[in-house]
Amino acid sequence: GGQKNGKKGGLIRGLLCVQFVIAITLLLCTGIVFKQLNYLQNKDLGLEKENVVSIYTGLWYNVDGFKQEILKNPNVRSVSMGAEITDYLEGDKSQGDVLRWTDERGETDSLRMMCIWADGDFVNTFGLKLLKGEGLKADGGAYFSGTYDFPVIINEAARKAMKVADPIGMEISGGFGVGTNKKRIVGVVQDFNFQSLRQKIKPAYLMYSPECLGNIHIKIAPEHKQETLNFIQKKFEEMAPFFIKEFKYKFFSDALNRNYEQERQQSRMLLAFTILAVVIAMMGVFGLVTLSTRQRTKEIGIRKVNGAHSGGIVKMFCLEYLKWVGIAFVPACPLGYLFMYHWLDEFAYRTTMSWWLFLGGGLIIAGITLLTVIGQTWRTASQNPVRSLRYE
């Protein structure tokens, strides 16, 4: 009978140890997922994402008057024309344009670049940092008269991929207007990222083309946001029938955050599973401690008669269960590391798996286990030893 009970007890402890492994692993994974999500939301993207409002006009012409009108408001810092925000955010779905140029050796080279439609105020509105050259000169008159020389600004990723020390003044061809015009590089901006940080920043160029600028991007002061939006809406409605009738706006920061909706859903699901795993593990601890104290009531009574303190008896039980947490911690760490290593590998830009996350997972389980064990054993350890022996 004793051997059978011993085997049964060993099996129960083994199952509890497995539950500890699962709980610690999930805690570790949850911590890293939340750390990565925080990293994604706070990483410097090379642009100003806060307080930029985007409005769909439905038309690319008759907007200059509207632009000048809203700039009269001191809370409106900058206004630019551009494409729809989701076009920038989903740029990674496009293959981009193949642009060609002649290098210093007189040989033709080419590079695939993403096109970002912009006007002369785009760099200022989004806070892009101009490293070399000058900004775009958006001249609608010259564009439609056929005298526009198509200046473009490239990002640093494009400059590095072109392997040219100074690209300012270089002519490139291809992309929009293939076979009809050449483009001239007038500036280089620091890399900026509209897309998800799952992918590296791609070579890109900014170019003015009025037909592609159906949205207005407005940089507003952080103070009096609603008041400024009401003012913009009033001026927008005064533009009827040139604009679409419905005034719709979105904040650029909100649109960017939607890039990581998948990660937020994953973090919520993982948190729910982690809580469930911890609860199940603690229920196992609770049940096992209850069974153990009942089986060892006589032992506890004898220890008390021989002078043992209640605290010492509780400590004995705590050390026993902490031992199982420690054993579970050993396989949980490499398991959590492997799972998260493969998950983080999906991101071009990622956080680090800090040592304190591993330690924290083990300490949380150890702490909850201690509270559960103390809560269950203190009552038994504190009762009169005569009563314990009589119970036996």
Per-region residue spans from a language model:
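"Rare, low-scoring activations can occur
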Residues: 67-79, 156-160, 177-267, 344
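Hydrophobic alpha-helical transmembrane segments of multi-pass inner-membrane transport and secretion
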Residues: 10-36, 264-298, 326-327, 364-371
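Transmembrane alpha-helical interface segments in multi-pass membrane proteins
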Residues: 277, 298-341, 357-360, 364
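Alpha-helical transmembrane segments of integral membrane proteins
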Residues: 1-58, 344, 386-392
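Membrane-proximal extracellular/periplasmic loop immediately following the first transmembrane helix
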Residues: 35-117, 145-147, 211-212
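Hydrophobic secondary-structure segments that place a key small or acidic residue at a functional site
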Residues: 111-202
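Membrane-helix entry/capping segments
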Residues: 2-14, 239-276, 295, 340-365
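Intracellular coupling helices
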Residues: 1-3, 283-324, 378-391
